Each structure stands twice: as structure tokens, then as C-alpha cells.
Amino acid sequence: MDKETLRALHVIVKGRVQGVGFRYWTRSLAKSLNVKGRVRNLADYSVEIIAEADTDTLGEFVYALKHEHPYARVESLNSEEVRARGYTDFRIEV
């Protein structure tokens, strides 16, 4: 993907998103959509995601984060565009 089409989002997901496999599901979703970046749990029980892809793919990714996990209950999802770092994969950080 070239630099003109690559976008990056910093996402904070709040709700019942820890202890339900959300990070592993997010990584699987990202790999299926060819999204690059990372996901990690935060101390306040939210989940932080950095995601890089084209605009349409990021839209699909964010929609799925909000609506498609079978056990999570997303109460809020906040995202902001950030500078792309050029991730080469999608990983879970601890």
C-alpha cells in the first residue's frame, strides 16, 4: 500500500472488552482485512488499538470492532487519525 492511501487510527474501546478474548479476536479480524498495527489492554480495562490500512478497510475494521465480537459489549469506541508508522504485521502487546 502506498503512502497516499495508508491511514492510521488510534482507537480506544471501552466496555466489557477484557477477559473475553477481544485482543485475539481483534488480531484475527485485522489479519483477515490486512490491517497492520497492534492491540493491548490498558489498566483502566479498556483496549487500545493502532490500526493502519486504507480508509475503506479501516471503516470496515472499526464497524466490526463495535458490533461483531460475540462476547464483548462495546460501550464506547473513540478513534482519531494519527501518523502511520508503517507496521508490517498486527500483533498483541502486553
Curated annotation (Swiss-Prot):
<feature type="domain" description="Acylphosphatase-like">
    <location>
        <begin position="8"/>
        <end position="94"/>
    </location>
</feature>
<feature type="active site">
    <location>
        <position position="41"/>
    </location>
</feature>
<dbReference type="InterPro" id="IPR001792">
    <property type="entry name" value="Acylphosphatase-like_dom"/>
</dbReference>
<keyword id="KW-0378">Hydrolase</keyword>
<feature type="active site">
    <location>
        <position position="23"/>
    </location>
</feature>
<protein>
    <recommendedName>
        <fullName>Acylphosphatase</fullName>
        <ecNumber>3.6.1.7</ecNumber>
    </recommendedName>
</protein>
<dbReference type="InterPro" id="IPR017968">
    <property type="entry name" value="Acylphosphatase_CS"/>
</dbReference>
<dbReference type="InterPro" id="IPR036046">
    <property type="entry name" value="Acylphosphatase-like_dom_sf"/>
</dbReference>
<dbReference type="GO" id="GO:0003998">
    <property type="term" value="F:acylphosphatase activity"/>
</dbReference>
<dbReference type="InterPro" id="IPR020456">
    <property type="entry name" value="Acylphosphatase"/>
</dbReference>
<comment type="similarity">
    <text>Belongs to the acylphosphatase family.</text>
</comment>
<dbReference type="Pfam" id="PF00708">
    <property type="entry name" value="Acylphosphatase"/>
</dbReference>
